[in-house]
Amino acid sequence: MQILNDKSYHTISEDIARPIEGRASRAWWIAFGITLLATLWGIWAIWVTLRDGIGARGLNKNVGWAWDITNFVWWIGIGHAGTLISAVLLLFRQQWRVAINRSAEAMTIFAVLQASIFPILHLGRPWLLHFNLPIPNQYGSLWDNFNSPLLWDVFAIATYFSVSLVFWWVGLLPDFAMLRDRALKPFQKKIYSLLSFGWSGRAKDWQRMEETMLLLAGIATPLVISVHTIVSFDFATSVVSGWHTTIFPPYFVAGAIFSGFAMVSLLLIILRKVCKLEAYTTLKHIELMNTVMLVAGSIVAVAYLTEFFTAMRSHSEFEQYVFHNRATGAYAWAFWTMIICNIVLPQLLWFKKLRRSITFSVCVALAVCVGMWFERFVIIVTSLHRGYLPSSWTMFSPTWVDIGIFVGTLGFFFLLFLLYARSFPMIAQAEVKGVRGQGTGVREQESLNSYLLTLTSPEELLDKIKELKSEGREIQEVYTPFYVHGLAEALGLKRTRLGKATFLYGLIGLFFGCWLTYFTMIKDWPMDIGGKPNATFWQNLPAFVPVIFELVLYFAAHLLVISFFIRSRLYPFKKAENPIKKSSDDKFVIQVRDKK
């Protein structure tokens, strides 16, 4: 898919660097002020919670999970689209992702940060957070309960956050190098030198990076599915009416993709206008994102119908009452808001004209974000506020502290995104250059030094390499601004062994996960939980699978990235080795051994 038709490589660099190198606009400062005020309100609400305790919130004897867990699940869902765009679409070679993946990855990281705030505060004593980690403590052999879905959450979300972070960071190395070589101020140059890890764009480094990104995509794909699946287990493994259902895992995953793409679409529509990136995030990209939202929304609609049909055919009066209460009870307004926002409005995306309408896309994206929040609210609150004893029935109403924390996370999320837009490239310039059409970029005359050949296109580069090899010249190194397909073969580079190493790293995670769960739950401190004694490892293995699975992915991803850095000799403050700065922008350099 052609991203551009009339942009040179240098123009792409100029366009993407402009929001970072230019002065912040008045609109940016206004948005910064608003988001900062919202963040400060959230900080005040958190301080009140820590000072007065959970009683400052709207929780009561029935609805112990309400605002916090609703917001937690919603933010985790928002964070799903970034890794999905980066990983799944990369594996399927969908080139349209390159204009949106970098901002989507940043959105994932910022959203997961917001999500982590709510369960930490919900602990009641957040200063004892470290008790959720399997580390020795002053109580002797008191370990975490690996049979608990709440602990599965800790491992799943921590793994998801860290893998998404390294995935994002590795992809940013060429972008940081481009900004480093363009920087005029010494402080900026030092910062981007630190962030780029001395990236020089050598051919072998590009080969390793391409394989590393593919392997990370392969690791992140099951991780994306596992995270919201495990989040759904918080509800599905309970015996609460309205929660105890097997449809929750796929239902939650589809809903996460739905809300995540809605937030990505909303952010990118705003950014393309404010930062003048219409040539990169085109109407075609918006149409494709709306298509994904249409598919995900249709799956969510089917899940709603399936969930309702299952409850009605269950012959359980308690299950039937929960769904009847949702549609006609005290929170019916929330239920029907969910239906309109998540089912009715997105189905209008069947019309191509509406899929390509900026105004309608913004409206649908906002509606889906609102609707998916109400979905989580309906699932949690309406299943709890009417229990088995009518005498204990109650209503939940959020306090200003509840509202303040949620508004604070919204403000902090957009505040981070504003700072990101002023400091980091919002578009993966190296990937955009690699998939652009045949542009009319400015050609510079080929310059020959004693050992350098400077070229202006990948086609010229490959032709020159063939010519030099036919002349018997020794090519010492090649530097390119982006990954050039066919370059490794032209230079005769051997395939890396990162794939085999990643498999071994996954085995290390498997053995560590098995040992950890066996030692803590079976050998050192066996516990009888709910009448289920931890007698043998194999009897309890199904409950240990989520933690073991996450540790396999954690070890495989992080040790892979460490191996990539070591093999490519990349580290903070390393001095870049590219002989000319333009090799990170729009020039292709061949370093040839002088015959002298």
Go through the PLM ranges and name each one.
Residues M1-I78, F414, L418-Y420, E431:
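N-terminal signal-anchor module of multipass membrane proteins
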